[in-house]
Structures are given as structure tokens and as C-alpha cells.
């Protein structure tokens, strides 16, 4: 990334012997990566040095290191041989809160803890019932009990409140929401450690945590659709109107909060939606919307 910032060159090295095969401008490579991400959703990108700086303290003390992630890159757990000479295979145990309904549960002290209990129960069930062929995964799950509580619907919540994505107000709400979640997750981990015992990785160093890792932002594309069409993960909505192709057929998907705004102007018509669709889901051409509404959608 420093080479991208300075418009420097980047060496393409052989994965076999590390020799430089070619040198290209770093920004050109970065642009190609971002273009591929937009068009195909891949490749996923992680910053491994940052990941290892942020691993739990007891994993640092144990000399554990993250070498890779899962495909979607939200799970970054230690793999390979640990200090006891045993193999670890990372395990994903995930759930996602719907920020679109944040106002319904934000002040409920028990809600997040209940979700963390659910994840802890799922982890225990996996450890107890997984076949011996999953021995490395069972061992890793037993030692660290890492889970990942994530979210979906962040952009939907902003649109619900008429807050443009990337605005100062959205940044304020972003920090407020995730501070609230993190505080409740941390408390749940300590409460469960008191009740059920700390995970072995943490207990070895006198640290009272039920979970080594607690949060992870997964893409949530499918479950966001199931949850009423909330926006996926923490991503901005790509288009206000688009065709969703499935095995059951093709369906026109329309932004539910834009629909309410159009109804306010008596413009919730097929003609207007068709116009939005032909403009790649954009509303910038709709002259009856205010500047704030255009920024929001």
C-alpha cells in the first residue's frame, strides 16, 4: 500500500522460488484488483501484518500467528502447529445482527449476550458431535472458542434515517453502533467465562475470556435477502433497483426506503422504477428529489 501511495513499482514474485518475474506500477495493479472486486466480488484482501498486531493478547503470549483467512476474509485465526505441537484448523462460528432493526434492540442489555450464548452453544455442540475426521478443527475450537458476531443492514439503517453513506453523521453513528455492540460482546464473554469457564487458551495466562475472538463482519449476501432485503454486511447498497437472478427465476429488487421516499412524492410508479433501473440503479437524474435525498440514495 505504501507503493500505491507513492506511485512506486511492485515486484511480481514466483510463489515457488521468490524470484522477481516482472515489475509493474503498484497503482495499476491496485486498480485492477479493485476493478475485479467490483465486477466479480473477488479477490478478497487482508492486511496480514495488521491482523497479527491485533490478535488477542493471550495468543500473542502463546506465540500463535495468523497465516491466512477464510475465503471471505472475516475469519483470521491461527492455524498450523501450536506450542504444544498440535495442529489447528480455524473454525467459523458466525451470526449477524441486523442493524436495520438497531432501534429495537440497542438498549436491551440481554440481547447481545443471548446471541453470544447461542454461538457458545453452537461451538460446544460442534466440539461434542463433530466426527474424528475434524480433529484439528475440534481441537482449535476447544482451545480458543473463537466466534464471530457480525452485522448486516448498516447502509439500510443510514437510509432509514436519511443519513448519506460516508457523511460525518454516518461516521458518528458507525462508531456509536459498534461501540455499543463491542461493549456488550466483551461483557458477555466475561459473564460466560464466570459461568462456564474461560477458554483454555485464555485461562493458561490468567485471562477471563470465554471467547478468544468475538466479532467478525461477514458478507451476509444471502441472509440479508432473507431478512427483508437489508443491505449486506457493512457495504453500501450497489443499486436502488436491479434484477436478481435465481434458480426460481429473475426478480426486480427495489430499495424499500427509496420506495417510501418516492411514495411521499407520489412517484412510486413502474415508470419511475424503470427509469432508475435503466440508469444503473441511480437516482441522480430524478429532479424531484432534494440534494440530501440524492446523497442518501
What is each of the regions a protein language model found here?
Residues 1-297:
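Long, C-terminal-biased catalytic regions of enzyme "large/alpha" subunits
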Amino acid at each position: 500500500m505504501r507503493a500505491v501511495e507513492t506511485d512506486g513499482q511492485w515486484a511480481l514474485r514466483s510463489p515457488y522460488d521468490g524470484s522477481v518475474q516482472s515489475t509493474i506500477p503498484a497503482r495499476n495493479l491496485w486498480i485492477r484488483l479493485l476493478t475485479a472486486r467490483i465486477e466479480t466480488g473477488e479477490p478478497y484482501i487482508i492486511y496480514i501484518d495488521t491482523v497479527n498486531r491485533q490478535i488477542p493478547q493471550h495468543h500473542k503470549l502463546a506465540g500463535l500467528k495468523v497465516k491466512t483467512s477464510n475465503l471471505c476474509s472475516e475469519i483470521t485465526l491461527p492455524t498450523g502447529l501450536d506450542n504444544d505441537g498440535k495442529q489447528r484448523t480455524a473454525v467459523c462460528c458466525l451470526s449477524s445482527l441486523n442493524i436495520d432493526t438497531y432501534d429495537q434492540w440497542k438498549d436491551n442489555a440481554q440481547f447481545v449476550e443471548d446471541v453470544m450464548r447461542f454461538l457458545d452453544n453452537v461451538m460446544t455442540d460442534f466440539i461434542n458431535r463433530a466426527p474424528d475426521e475434524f480433529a484439528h478443527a475440534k481441537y482449535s475450537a476447544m482451545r480458543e472458542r473463537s466466534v464471530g458476531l457480525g452485522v448486516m443492514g448498516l447502509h439500510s439503517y443510514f437510509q432509514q434515517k436519511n443519513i448519506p453513506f460516508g457523511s460525518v453523521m454516518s461516521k458518528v453513528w458507525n462508531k456509536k453502533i459498534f461501540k455499543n455492540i463491542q461493549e456488550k460482546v466483551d461483557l458477555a464473554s466475561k459473564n460466560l467465562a464466570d459461568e462456564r469457564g474461560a477458554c483454555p487458551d485464555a485461562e493458561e495466562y490468567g485471562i477471563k475470556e470465554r471467547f478468544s475472538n468475538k466479532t467478525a463482519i461477514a458478507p451476509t449476501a444471502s441472509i440479508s435477502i432473507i431478512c427483508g432485503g437489508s443491505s449486506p454486511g457493512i457495504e453500501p447498497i450497489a443499486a436502488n433497483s436491479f434484477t436478481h437472478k435465481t434458480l426460481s427465476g429473475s426478480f426486480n429488487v427495489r430499495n424499500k426506503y427509496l420506495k417510501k421516499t418516492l411514495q411521499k412524492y407520489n412517484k412510486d410508479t413502474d415508470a419511475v422504477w424503470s427509469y432508475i433501473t435503466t440508469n444503473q440503479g441511480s437516482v441522480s437524474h430524478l429532479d424531484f428529489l432534494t440534494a440530501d435525498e440524492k446523497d442518501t440514495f
